[in-house]
Structures are given as structure tokens and as C-alpha cells.
């Protein structure tokens, strides 16, 4: 779309961050705009709506100080683009891809549209191959697969930022560590959170393989809508042009949806559920569906978007619609967090729909699927018995039931709980699982084949 620069001075309305420009022609949706005030200050914007002879422009920096007279609006004839290069790894940028770390200007030979290139569905390859995060609750029971989109559902005050930073530092495709990169997109975060991520990546030495796109809470809402798209544009370049395996972590998608609702209200659109626009589903899909693998390309994009559920409500429109688009979810538990368990992952509410594609011989270990199924069944039984114990007392339970109670405690303290900088291999995760399963009678391990028990059960391995 190369329409050339067109200049107009006839602003008919200013409302919130929006300008309505009359008498325009050959203006395209999503076109980038330059707004020059009467005082000579230049601001950037984007076309949100095009009608018969008019265009609605969202000004990134807001419309304060802009008057209908004396203001020049220039339509630039192109969409918003960012530079893309491998040199952006190790750099910290704002939501528009501009460096904010005090380093040199990004020198790139190529610029790309932040909306990404259309991808033919027939060219998609099915997600497969294990991504090791070093977190037992994810690797062992909700395995992340290369090309998958697996969100983390959290709540206010829960340690999702710490978990996101840990995964960004530790995640890797086994055997291809040197070709793995992380693109980290922070949407509407507080400055304290930005400093936490920056310090964590610098101290742990992870910053060299991480490209950070940061949008702070005091920045315009429109930038929140661009930030994840800019991050994914770089991820697509690294994956499909540089053959890298890219993990994209986006936090917090709730801030993104709130910005979308704010802009929708300013445009006076008919609201949908809880005031969010009716196109919330398709808008979220335009971000989540940029994950995946492409036939004939070595690289891949894996997404772990993080969202905080308002009032811990998993039926809220944001997590509800996200669940329809993505391939599972990791759910954080406030009850586990209050008991001092980190990461507080509720495995009974969590699910990775593509787990079966990334585990087993040659990928993780032959016993992985059986052990995971047994952990789910045994922990679920232990949690049920806790509720029963609160009514009848532990003395009323059988010896078998007491073993399940002990297993549930060990599962939370030995398997779920781990250090913030503790990076467990999948072998360590499965070995811990066998240790805690060994407190149960062998006849209770009904989800594991006898030959697998003979090979991996601590009782037989010790012999």
C-alpha cells in the first residue's frame, strides 16, 4: 500500500484520543498518520475507521493541545512498520519497536508491517517437539509443545510475573539451545514491574537472547494494542527468516483487552459482554493465531500469553474467549499461593491439549504419559480426601486413604514447589514424580504398565 503522503487541515471533531478528518480520499484502514499541531509538535496516529469522505484517526500520544484550526494531518500511505533484525535480541524497546535502553539506534535493512503477513492455513505444520521450561508442573503435566499457544490464567497479586521471567530465562528446545530466542512483550505494566524484569534478565544472563517490548501503564492505550503485534512481527522474522525457535511471552492480555474496550467506547461502538467490543474474539485471535509452524521452515513461534482474571473469574470474557482460541491453559491458584507454594499452578484445572505430541520416546521419556496420568488421578483423589477429612476426621480414614493424603502433601511440596531459579530437566521432574508415587501401594498405580513400574519405580531401581 504505497499511496504517498497526503495532507489535510480540515478536522471536524476531536473526542478523547480521536480526530475526525473530513474531505479525505484514498485513505486506508490502519494507515499510519502524522499529526502536526499549530505549535509545530509532531505526533503519530493510525486510521481506525474510513467512511465516505472522512477518516477517524487515533492519536498515539493523545489529543491534548490539538485544536481543529492550525493542525495538519498527514496520511503517510503505509501501515505501521518496525525494523527487524537479530540485533534486537538483548535490547529493550518500547511498544513501537524503538530502543529505550540507552543503546544505539537499531540499524536494520528490513522493516515489516506490525500486522504480520497472511499465512495460508494449508501451509501450517502441526505443533510438535517438547519445549523444556524447567518448571515441573508444566513440563511434567501440562507440556508446552513447539508451535503451541498455551496461556497462563492468573489473578491480581499472584506471581505470574515471576513465573513469566523464570520461563523466559529457562525455556529451551532440547538439543537446539543456540537457536532458541525469547520475545517478551509487556503491556500496560507498572514501572516497578518493568524494573523487575529488566533486573532479573540482566542478573541471570538471559537478556542476551531476549528482545523486550515494553509498554508502561502511563502510556497511551493505542500503544497497548500495537505492542504485542510489534513483538510478534520480530518473532515471525526470527522464526521464518532466521530459522530460530521463538517463545513469545505476552503479559498482560487483560490490559490489552481493557485498552480495546476504552478505544471502542471512544468510537461509540455498540458494546458486547461487560462493555467489551463484539469483535474481542476475532481481535484476540489475530494475536494468538500468529503462533505456529510453517511447512518447509525450520523455525517456529510458541506463545505463552498471560492474563489476570478479574476477581479470579475464569468465566470472564477475556479468559473465556482466550480458552476457545488457544490450546489449553495453565491456571494459577490463590489457595496454593497463600500456602507458600511457588509456582502455585493448579494442575487439576490446567490442560495442554497438544501435550501428547511433544512427549514420549525420543522427545522426553517413555514413561512420561503414564506418570502424568497417574499423578493427575492420585492427586485428584488426595484432594477429595482432604475435603472428606475436614468432615469425618483423619482417624476415620483407611490406611490406603492416609497414603493418598500423604501423596497430595508430597506432590505440592516436592513436585509443584520449586525455587524461582531452579531449572529442572524433564528427567529430574519425572524422577521426583516416581519418588512421591512410591508412597502409594504399588497396586494403586493403575495408570502405569507393570513393565514401566519395574523399570522406573524407586523400589526396583534401588535393587
From Swiss-Prot:
Give Gene Ontology CC terms.
Answer: plasma membrane; proton-transporting two-sector ATPase complex, catalytic domain
Which Gene Ontology BP terms does the record give?
A: proton motive force-driven plasma membrane ATP synthesis
Q: What is its main location?
A: membrane
Q: Which domain of life is it from?
A: Archaea
UniProt topology in membrane = Peripheral membrane protein
Which InterPro entries does this chain map to?
ATP-synt_VA_C, ATPase_a/bsu_AS, ATPase_A1-cplx_bsu, ATPase_F1/V1/A1_a/bsu_N, ATPase_F1/V1/A1_a/bsu_nucl-bd, P-loop_NTPase, V-ATPase_su_B/beta
**Record-linked SUPFAM superfamilies:** C-terminal domain of alpha and beta subunits of F1 ATP synthase (SSF47917), P-loop containing nucleoside triphosphate hydrolases (SSF52540)
Q: Where in the cell is it found?
A: Cell membrane
GO-annotated molecular function: ATP binding; proton-transporting ATP synthase activity, rotational mechanism; proton-transporting ATPase activity, rotational mechanism
Q: Which UniProt keywords apply?
A: ATP synthesis, Cell membrane, Hydrogen ion transport, Ion transport, Membrane, Transport
Question: By its UniProt entry, which HAMAP family does this protein fall under?
Answer: ATP_synth_B_arch (MF_00310)
Subunit: Has multiple subunits with at least A(3), B(3), C, D, E, F, H, I and proteolipid K(x).
Q: Which family does it belong to?
A: Belongs to the ATPase alpha/beta chains family.
- Report the PANTHER family cross-referenced here: V-TYPE PROTON ATPASE SUBUNIT B (PTHR43389:SF4)
Q: What does this protein do?
A: Component of the A-type ATP synthase that produces ATP from ADP in the presence of a proton gradient across the membrane. The B chain is a regulatory subunit.
Its protein name is A-type ATP synthase subunit B
Amino acid at each position: 500500500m504505497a499511496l504517498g503522503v497526503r495532507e489535510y487541515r480540515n478536522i471536524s471533531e476531536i473526542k478523547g484520543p480521536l480526530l475526525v478528518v473530513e474531505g479525505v480520499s484514498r485513505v486506508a484502514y490502519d494507515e499510519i498518520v502524522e499529526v502536526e499541531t499549530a505549535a509545530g509538535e509532531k505526533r503519530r496516529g493510525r486510521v481506525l475507521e474510513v467512511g465516505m469522505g472522512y477518516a477517524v484517526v487515533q492519536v498515539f500520544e493523545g489529543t491534548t493541545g490539538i485544536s481543529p484550526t492550525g493542525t495538519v494531518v498527514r496520511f503517510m500511505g503505509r501501515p505501521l512498520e518496525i525494523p527487524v533484525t537479530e540485533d534486537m535480541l538483548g535490547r529493550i524497546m518500547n511498544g513501537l519497536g524503538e530502543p529505550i535502553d540507552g543503546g544505539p539506534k537499531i540499524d536494520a535493512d528490513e522493516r515489516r508491517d506490525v500486522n504480520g503477513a497472511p499465512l495460508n492455513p494449508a501451509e501450517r505444520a502441526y505443533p510438535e517437539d517438547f519445549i523444556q521450561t524447567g518448571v515441573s508442573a508444566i513440563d511434567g503435566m501440562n507440556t508446552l509443545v513447539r508451535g503451541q499457544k498455551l496461556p497462563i490464567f492468573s489473578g491480581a497479586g499472584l506471581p505470574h510475573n515471576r513465573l513469566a521471567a523464570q520461563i523466559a530465562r529457562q525455556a529451551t528446545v532440547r538439543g537446539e539451545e543456540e537457536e532458541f530466542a525469547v520475545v517478551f512483550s509487556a503491556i500496560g505494566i507498572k514501572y516497578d514491574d518493568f524494573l523487575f524484569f529488566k533486573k532479573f534478565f540482566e542478573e541471570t544472563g538471559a537478556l542476551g537472547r531476549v528482545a523486550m517490548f515494553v509498554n508502561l501503564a502511563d502510556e497511551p492505550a493505542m500503544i497497548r494494542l500495537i505492542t504485542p503485534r510489534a513483538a510478534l512481527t520480530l518473532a515471525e522474522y526470527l522464526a521464518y527468516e532466521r530459522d530460530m525457535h521463538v517463545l513469545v511471552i505476552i503479559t498482560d492480555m487483560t490490559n490489552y483487552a481493557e485498552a480495546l474496550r476504552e478505544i471502542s467506547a471512544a468510537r461509540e461502538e455498540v458494546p458486547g459482554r461487560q462493555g467489551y467490543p463484539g469483535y474481542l474474539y476475532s481481535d484476540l485471535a489475530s494475536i494468538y493465531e500468529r503462533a505456529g509452524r510453517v511447512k518447509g521452515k525450520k523455525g517456529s513461534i510458541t506463545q505463552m500469553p498471560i492474563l489476570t482474571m478479574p476477581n479470579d473469574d475464569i468465566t470472564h470474557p477475556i479468559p473465556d474467549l482466550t480458552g476457545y482460541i488457544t490450546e489449553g491453559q495453565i491456571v494459577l491458584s490463590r489457595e496454593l499461593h497463600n500456602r507458600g507454594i511457588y509456582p502455585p499452578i493448579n494442575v487439576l484445572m490446567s490442560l495442554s491439549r497438544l501435550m501428547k505430541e511433544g512427549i514420549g520416546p525420543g522427545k522426553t521419556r517413555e514413561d512420561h504419559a503414564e506418570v502424568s496420568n497417574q499423578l493427575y488421578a492420585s492427586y485428584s483423589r488426595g484432594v477429595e480426601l482432604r475435603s472428606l477429612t475436614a468432615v469425618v476426621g483423619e482417624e476415620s480414614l483407611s490406611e490406603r486413604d492416609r497414603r493418598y493424603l500423604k501423596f497430595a502433601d508430597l506432590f505440592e511440596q516436592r513436585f509443584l514447589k520449586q525455587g524461582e531459579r531452579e531449572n529442572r530437566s524433564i528427567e529430574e521432574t519425572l524422577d521426583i514424580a516416581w519418588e512421591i508415587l512410591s508412597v502409594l501401594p504399588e497396586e494403586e498405580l493403575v495408570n502405569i504398565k507393570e513393565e514401566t513400574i519395574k523399570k522406573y519405580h524407586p523400589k526396583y531401581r534401588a535393587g
